[in-house]
């Protein structure tokens, strides 16, 4: 990102490994935090206050804007998450969007396929919704 220069203050991390040193990932808002084993990598960017925690993985060219992501969630490719919350072991990828105060709560083991995880992918858009368990949205 061309707007980040040496010495620019960003958000908080609890471990230098939380923010990858390769790529152009950045935590823009000083009120954002990445902690408890969570990582931000690639060209991912976090704007507005964000909380990323508990082994969540944010990578590639994702954009989190005022979002909370935690508990093993994987966000990759070109995903946008705005003003929403994603919790639990799930994968949101491709060009999916989670918008407008949506809540994603993933939980494995609630169907006969105990290994299936919640996924939102392709060009799916979730807006003002609650998505739970092992849903597959595309």
Per-segment meaning from a language model:
Residues 1-22:
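Functional cleft and adjacent loop/helix regions within the main domain
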Residues 18-28, 32-138:
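Structural signal for interior beta-strand "rungs" in well-ordered beta-sheet cores
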């Amino acid at each position: 990102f061309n707007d980040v220069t040496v010495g620019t203050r960003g958000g908080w991390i609890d471990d230098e490994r939380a923010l990858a040193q390769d790529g152009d990932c950045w935590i823009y808002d000083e009120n954002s935090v990445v902690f408890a084993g969570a990582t931000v990598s690639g060209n991912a960017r976090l704007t507005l206050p964000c909380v990323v925690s508990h082994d969540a993985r944010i990578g590639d060219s994702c954009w989190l804007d005022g979002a909370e992501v935690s508990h093993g969630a994987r966000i990759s490719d070109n995903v946008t998450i705005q003003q929403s919350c994603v919790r639990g072991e799930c994968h949101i990828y491709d060009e999916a969007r989670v918008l407008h105060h949506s809540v994603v709560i993933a939980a494995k083991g609630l169907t006969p396929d105990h290994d299936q995880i919640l996924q939102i992918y392709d060009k799916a858009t979730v807006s003002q919704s609650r998505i739970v368990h092992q849903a597959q949205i595309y």
